[in-house]
A protein has these predicted regions:
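Outer-membrane beta-barrel proteins
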Residues: 1-312
């Protein structure tokens, strides 16, 4: 075979490989939103305008063997792209079918079977620029795997996760259960363990919600116990009222306790959401005391925010 034929066949093979590698199509989704927020008390003060700045690239398909494959990449301005996976933020690959369940590999931005449940009943209202640190949880996020078992019984979801650590980082494993077999009721339990050299930490979450008529009630508690260091506990509850198909009102409260501190961080918020003609307007007022476990004025912070999002 002469060199010209070899070059031609090599180019054809490369073209076929490239074609098969990019056989799936990716779609792009974003959101149109604008808002204003105002902080007072401890931390940063003043008003700030905001707008949606996140794009999600996603694609999916099915192999000849009947395995569903989906891929997701998120571009989020200002998020932690400095970890080396930039320009992307969260990104994951998902494999699933009815008999094998669902396996998710997260290169960044994943959750453990415990941390996926540890969002507080009030909706993590601490995470509003008030100066409150993120509560501790079982390690996950980068280079982690989450497996959701196929259905074992009606209305029961079982998940398991593992993060191998690496480069001296902690390894972690977790398991979680959610049962929704009673009308209006959902109950979840998650437990995770994080191991580093000479230290071990356990995180557990229990939470539940119950919808009755126009009301929804929620409770949650997460405990983080560590061999060396201070233990953490977060307790939360919420009450939501659906006024109509368009309008809802929610009140939520959280208490963050840390071993070694006599002052708890306490957060409460009231919010409302109204939807009409493809536009959703939301407003919230949030108040915190004991920020950074400080007493008096030094530990007080407030925020109000208003936002509008558009579906089209």
């Amino acid at each position: 075979m002469n060199n010209f034929k070899k070059v031609g066949l090599t180019a054809l093979a490369g073209s076929l490989l490239a074609t098969s590698a990019y056989a799936g199509a990716m779609s792009v989704a974003g959101s149109a939103s604008i808002g204003v927020k105002n902080n007072s008390g401890s931390g940063t003060h003043g008003k700030v305008w905001t707008m949606g700045n996140q794009l999600t690239f996603s694609g999916s398909g099915e192999t000849d063997g009947g395995i569903n494959v989906s891929l997701s990449f998120v571009i989020d301005q200002g998020d932690d792209t400095a970890i080396g996976s930039g320009p992307f933020d969260s990104h994951s690959l998902t494999l699933s079918n009815d008999s094998m369940g669902t396996l998710v590999f997260s290169g960044e931005g994943g959750s453990s079977a415990q941390s996926t449940l540890d969002g507080t009943a009030a909706g993590d209202i601490w995470d509003n620029g008030l100066g409150i640190s993120s509560p501790s949880a079982s390690e996950a996020g980068n280079n982690s795997m989450m497996y959701t078992l196929p259905s074992l019984m009606d209305d029961l979801t079982v998940q398991a996760s593992y993060s191998p650590g690496g480069a001296g980082g902690p390894s972690a494993s977790a398991i979680g259960f959610t049962y929704a077999g009673v009308e209006g009721l959902s109950v979840s339990y998650g437990a995770g363990q994080t191991e580093t050299v000479g230290s071990e930490a356990d995180a557990t979450t229990i939470k539940g919600s119950y919808a009755y008529g126009s009301f929804t009630f929620g409770l949650s508690q997460t405990d983080y116990d560590v061999d060396s260091g201070n233990d953490d506990e977060v307790e939360s509850y919420k009450i939501s009222y659906t006024v109509s198909d368009d309008l809802s009102i929610t009140y939520g409260s959280e208490t963050h306790s840390t071993g070694g501190s006599t002052t708890d961080e306490e957060v409460e918020a009231i919010s409302a959401s109204f939807t009409s003609g493809g536009m959703t307007v939301s407003a919230a007022a949030i108040e915190a005391t004991g920020v950074d476990h400080s007493t008096g004025k030094a530990g007080e912070a407030e925020r109000w925010k208003i936002s509008a999002s558009f579906a089209f």
